[in-house]
């Protein structure tokens, strides 16, 4: 099980609010926030706003891709990919170039993913069943 704090933006205060609402892991966050009704309930129980809950659920969803993790999920999000649905529709070579440019501008990761890694992410996204409903 993955700690909530591995998601960028979830620090001790937000993690405490989520735990008080019954969410202790990234996996539990994804399960609870997979539907609009689930996110609304989570917002009410945690007293955290809709935009943050949705952002974190999307990151949790991206973290299902093997090799993405907390570091690369931030890079993907900054490059304009914040859902698995969006990732599955990307051309790996174009996405790789966008990741390079994003990292040059924002210095988010020390080591960029390889083109082979990005190809693998896109392929995984194409076969993973959808979890988040919008």
Regions found by a protein language model. Give the residues of each.
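C-terminal extensions
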Residues: 1-134
